[in-house]
Amino acid sequence: MKPTHIEHLGIAVTSIEEAAPFFEFLSGNKCYSIEVVEDQKVRTAFFKVGEVKSELLEPTSPESTIAKFIEKNGGRGGVHHVAFNVENVAEALAECEAAGIQLIDKAPRKGAENLMIAFLHPKSTKGVLTELCQQPA
């Protein structure tokens, strides 16, 4: 597996509306995309800094993994994951599994911005929740 670049940093927030002004100031750019990813129970907002994106993640349900992350983090949110772009998520997952890395997702699934995504378990990635992303065809 050879990632081409860091695709984005995922940042959990309690409210995109409250967090967006800070990230607009920090990045020097306006948010360019907001969408809801129903199956992940999350609302996302993207900001670009150079070639790397920041993805704000707001829970849409108290049962979402983002809501649970925020709760575990004292209600404050924070850095949730690092995402790497790969040419083929399915192949990258197979390589990771063969290398003994614990997978959260056994197969790619659709994420925000029409990316195909899969997560690697932090127990196998030195404590960092890691996402693999494949650009849409």
Residues covered by each model-derived region:
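Vicinal oxygen chelate
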Residues: M1-K2, V13-P21, L26, E35, A45-K48, E55, S61-E63, G74-K123, ...
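Residues embedded in well-ordered beta-strands within globular domains across many folds
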Residues: E7-G10, A83, C133
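Extracellular/lumenal glycan-associated surfaces
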Residues: G28, V52-E55, H81, C133
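Short connector loops at helix/strand junctions that flank enzyme active sites
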Residues: V42, V49-E51, G74-V79
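Regulatory and interaction patches adjacent to catalytic/ligand-binding sites
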Residues: A67-N73
